[in-house]
Amino acid sequence: DAYSIACKEGADMLAFPEMFLTGYQTQDLVQKSAFVEDAQSKLIEFAKECSDGPTIGIGVPLQDGDKVYNAYAILQNGKIITQIRKHHLPNYKVFDEKRVFDSGEIHGPYVVNGVRIGSPICEDAWFPDVCETLEETGAEILISPNGSPYYRGKFDKRISLMVSRAVENNLPMAYLNLVGGQDDQVFDGGSFVINSDGALALQMPLFEENIETITFKRTQDGWVAQEGKKASYPDHWEQDYHVMVLALRDYMKKTGFKKALLGMSGGIDSALVAAIACDALGSENVRLVMLPSKYTSQNSLDDAANCANLLKAKIQTIPISDSFNSVLKTLEPIFEGLDEDTTEENIQSRLRGLLLMGLSNKFNEMLLTTGNKSEVSVGYSTIYGDMAGGFNPIKDLYKVRVFETSRWRNNNYFSWMKGSRGEVIPNEIIQKPPTAELRNDQKDSDSLPDYEILDGILEMLMDNDASVADCVVAGYELSDVKHVEKLLYLSEYKRFQSAPGTRLSLKAFWLDRRYPIANKWRDNK
C-alpha cells in the first residue's frame, strides 16, 4: 500500500488528495456529526498506526463546535499536528460547499524535516491569494490536495492554473487529485508536479490509482523537483470513453452489484452501452436481453445478436407480443372508440421495463438505461419504461457523439478495457437510421429534427444558455428551435426521475443544471 511504499522509499512525506479518508463529494453526510466524528476517529487510528513512518497529509472533514470544515490533516509521529481548513469554497456547477462547509482562515505553512510546506486545498489554488499568503509566510514547496472531477478539457485548465500559481510565487507545486467514480462524477487523477518556472517535472496517468516518489533538491534559487515519469496524455475520445467505463465500474462496486443487464434494441445506443458494460465489468458479467414486438424488424434482431456475439456476451430473447396483447385486451373496454396513439407505444416500453426489472430483481443484476443526452434532453423516452434502471453511462453523450464514440471504440482497444478487441458494434447498427420500433415504419426523424440539427440546437440552448434568437442567428430554423425548446422544458419531470449517469461535460443533467418542473416561461423574444 501507499504507506508501505513510502516507508520503503524513505520518503519524508506521504501526501493524499482532498477528502481522501471519506471520499468526495459526501454532500450532506458531513452535516451529520456522527459521520464527521467517525472520520476523525479513523484519522486518529491511522495516525497511531503510521507513527514510525513519514509525515502524512490526508483530506478529511473536521467539526469544530457548530462549524464543519473541508480539512487537510498533517500527521507526524502518531499525532495530528494540524488540520488546514479550506478557505475558498466552490459553490457552482456540481459543487455546493457553501451549503455543507464553513470557510476557514488562510493557514500558514507546516514543517516537514525542516522544509516549510504550504497546502492550498483545491479551490484555494484556483485563486492567487492563498498561495501568495503561503509564499509570504515562508512556504518553500506547495502541495495542493484536490478532489477535481472530470469534464471534457478539464485537465488542460488545471495545468494552466497551477502553472500560474507556481510562476507567480516562484515555488514548485505538487498537484494531487482523486481517482474514481462517485455517483455521476468521475475524479480522473492525473496528478502532476511542476517547478517554479512552470516546467512539468512529473505527470501521473489519468484514471489510474498510482503512487510515485518525487525528489526535491535545494538550489540557490530554491527547491527544484527532479525529473520523474511522464505519463502519456490520451485524446478526448479516449478520455470520455474511459470516464464512462470507470463511472460504471465504480458505481457498480460501491452499490454492491457485480453484474449488469440491459435491453438490446438492435440500435446504436444500447450497443454502445453494452460495449461500455463489457469493458467495465467483463462480458461474462453482462446480460443482454432482446424484447421484440410485432414492430421489431428482423434486421434489429440480427444486429442485436451480432453485437452480442462480437462482445462475447450472452443474449436472451423475451418476446412481448403476447403480454402486449393481453394488456390491450384488459384495457379494451376502457379504450373503446379511441384511436391508437403514443399510449400503445409506451405500453410496449413499460412492458420491457417490467420484464427487465424482474430479471434485475431475480438475479441481483443492475439494469442499465441507454438514453443518450439528445433523448434525455427532449424526453424522447418512456418514463417507467426504457428509463427504468439504476445507471446510464451515456446520459451526457449527445447522439452525434454516440455514433462517433462507437466508431472510435471499434478502432481502439486498451489494457483497461475488459471487453473484446476489434469491432464490437456492427457497422450495420452504426449506419442504419435510428428508430424506436414502437409502430410501423417509425423513425426518430418523424418526431425530432435530424440529430445534427437537434444536437446543435441543444448545445446552444442548454450547454451555452443561448436564447432562441441566438439559435436563429446561428442558422437554425425558428420552428425547429421553438420545438426543441418546448420539449426541453416539458421533459423536466422525466429527468427528475431518471437514473444517474456519467458526467462528461460542463452542463450535465443533475447538479450542473437545476430547473423547476412546473414553470411556463418560454423565450418568446
Features from the language model and the residues they span:
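Enzyme catalytic cores with a strong preference for nitrogen-chemistry domains
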Residues: 1-263, 274-285, 290, 315
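ATP/NTP-dependent adenylation/nucleotidyl-transfer catalytic domains that generate, transfer
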Residues: 170, 196, 223-266, 270-525
